[in-house]
Structures are given as structure tokens and as C-alpha cells.
Amino acid sequence: MIFQNTLEFAQQLDNQDELKEYKNEFIFPQHEGKNVIYFTGNSLGLQPKSARNYVDEVMNDWANLAVEGHFYADKPWWDYQERFANPLSKIVGAKPLEVTVMNTLTVNLHLLMVSFYRPTKKRYKIICEEKAFPSDQYMFQSQVNFHGYKPEDAIVEIKRREGEHNIRLEDILSKIEAVGDELALVLFGGVNYYTGQVFDMKTITEAGHKQGAKVGFDLAHAAGNIKLELHDWNVDFAAWCSYKYMNSGPGNASGCFVHEKHHSDSNLPRFAGWWGHNKERRFKMEPTFDPVHGADGWQISNLPILSLAPYLASVEMFAEVGIEKLIRKRNQITAYLEFILHEIDKEVKGHFEILTPTNQEERACQLSVFLHGEGRSLFDYLMKNGVVTDWREPNVIRLAPVPLYCSFEDMYNFGQILKKGILEN
């Protein structure tokens, strides 16, 4: 398709958009009586209008049933997480018994590393991406320290080549091969939070397994954003947060994936708690742990139902829409945003460059724009003019045109505001 930088063309794309009605299913912050242009679904998704009803349902059950709500609520609390199995499995490409909801993202990665990072004197190294999200970096360092190794030796970061913004797949694969039988774990982000680069998880998993290592992924910026096939890719484990593209609310519960090949491995260590115990015998208060078969067996504590309620509202919307439709629009609207940025660059050369790969297979719903010069003033200008973007040091504005609630007209209007902001700043 040949794009045009006109309001009429953007509105034409909106008229053809198969997801256009979903924009009305979300609540937008307001600027001068109008919806803001919201580009920060990669940080915190908007609130679905249905979320309040799901929360109110739990509040009413709590008020009217109190403790009996565990078994007699409309959606009984004791097995509330089971409602997530089917929709989440479709979002991440898994079998329903391979996914669960619990805790928050870094907590879950720590718990999964109990099972899948089992260093020995010979095999103890972790391979990760350079400039992973800081919480992952702290996790790696603390895990390595806990096991008695030195981070500068045990953590191997794959770096970008000089003058390049993204990590080459060939460099990842060659490093995995070079570390070889010293490699205990490969743990990458599915999508790099800073650049928006999508990693080839299937190929990375195959390479890690070839060296005898376990392979996992932090899917914070991938779940609900890209096509995932965790089961078929043979990924050992993964975790994600739900408050970005999955719109569950600030700091809300995480999700986990554990491949079914590990479910019956009695030698696999894990930290245990009563909510991971055999569901049929959970309330018999037995002294010996008998894990639930499947990813639910990694649960530890009773689940926060009030937090899960808006999460359930969101995943049920995802089930209604389907990941294929989301990806079709994501590709088109991200490409249109990229086109708008290039059109502006023709007029105001040298003010910015896009760090994110141009190849659609290597990016998702994010364009990271590096600003030359004093970028913070431009960011502030956008915010003051009703464009909510995300600032990341050094000098990057991240733009996430989330397909469920961003429109093509939003992209056009953003371009007009951005151009004016550059010229005025």
C-alpha cells in the first residue's frame, strides 16, 4: 500500500479498520476536552471500560458472601485462575496447562530460575542481551551472587556492533556456541524494551538447547503484542507482565509458561506453597507437597482476586478479537507511523532517527525515536499538546501505536503536532 500523509487518507484507513470499534471500549485521559493520543501502552495500557464491572462483581461477592465467595461466587475464587488458561494459551502459543497467573514479573522469573538455573562448577553461565531491562539485570546479578559466582564472569551479554542499534541474530548464535558447555541458561527479552527489537526466539531456543542449556524469555513487551508459539518453539519457560499490552492495570499480576515436558520431572526443584498443591486436596492441609500437574504447580500463594478481575476482562477481550487481527493492524499502523516520521524527517532533517528495525519480522508495536540535541523539551511539548509518549534515557521517545485503541487519524495528528514541536523547539 502507498501511504499518504493526509487526514483524508488516515480516515480512510480507519474506515477500513476491522478493529475500529474497540477504541470505544477503553477510557482515555482527556486533553482540552478530547482524548489524548496515547502511545504508552508499552508502559501501561489503557483501562478497558469492562474492567470496572469485573472488579465490582468481586466486590459485591465479597460483600454478600464474604469467605463463602471462595466456592459460591459467580466466579468462585478458589479456581479463578483457571479462567485464564484458554485465553492466555492462545496469546502466548501454549497448551492451557502450560500457563498460569501469579505474582509479578521479576518475582516469577526468580521463581522459575529456581527450577531452570541450576549451575554447576562447569556449567554456570547465563547469556542475555546487552541493556536488558534493569530489573532483569538485577535479577541476573542477584541469582549469580546467590549461587556463589561472580557476575562479571557468569553473565555474558550479547552486545550491539559498533555504530548499530540492534543485536544481530548471528552474534547471538555465535556467542551461544562459543560459551558452549559452560552455558547453563539463555534468558532474553522477547522484545527489547528500549529499541523495540523482536528477537528470533525459535532460533535462539534451538541454539541454546543444542549446547545443553535451558532457554527462557521475559515477555514483558511481547505478550499481547507479537505472535508467540512458546510450545512449538520448545521454550523451557517464560513470564510476562499484564499491565502493558494486556491492559490489566498498574502493577498487576504476571503470567507464566512452563513447557509440558517439565511438568512430570520430579527432580526439578521449585519453591512450593499451598496454592501449587493438588487442587482436590488443597484444603485437607496435608504436610507433604503434591504439585498440581502443569504450570499451576509453580503457584505459591492464594491469588489476589481483585487484581485478577481487570486482567480477566482484558484477556477475554483478546479472546474475542484474536491475535491474528491484532497483528494485522499492528503491522499496518506501525508502518503508517513510520511513514509519517519519515515524511517529517524530509522536512526537518537531522532532528531524529528511528532505532527500531524496519523489517516487520524484527519489530512489534513500538518505534523508538532517538532525538539529536535537546530531546526532553520536545517530549515535554508533546505532553503539553495531548500526546502521551514515553521517555527513556538517553534521549529516546518510545511510541507504541497499540492496535486495540490507537487510530490512523491519531498517527496523522501526532505527525502534525510533532512537526510543529520540532520547528518551535
Curated annotation (Swiss-Prot):
The gene is kynU. It comes from Flavobacterium psychrophilum (strain ATCC 49511 / DSM 21280 / CIP 103535 / JIP02/86). Belongs to the kynureninase family. The modification N6-(pyridoxal phosphate)lysine is found at K244. Pyridoxal 5'-phosphate binds at L105, T106, F133, P134, S135, D136, D218, H221, Y243, W274, N302. It comes from the Bacteria. GO terms for cellular component: cytoplasm. NCBIfam families: kynureninase. This is Kynureninase. Catalyzes the cleavage of L-kynurenine (L-Kyn) and L-3-hydroxykynurenine (L-3OHKyn) into anthranilic acid (AA) and 3-hydroxyanthranilic acid (3-OHAA), respectively. One of its GO terms (molecular function) is pyridoxal phosphate binding. InterPro entries: Aminotrans_V_dom (IPR000192), Kynureninase (IPR010111), PyrdxlP-dep_Trfase (IPR015424), PyrdxlP-dep_Trfase_major (IPR015421), PyrdxlP-dep_Trfase_small (IPR015422). Gene3D superfamilies: Aspartate Aminotransferase, domain 1, Type I PLP-dependent aspartate aminotransferase-like (Major domain). Pathway: Amino-acid degradation; L-kynurenine degradation; L-alanine and anthranilate from L-kynurenine: step 1/1; Cofactor biosynthesis; NAD(+) biosynthesis; quinolinate from L-kynurenine: step 2/3.
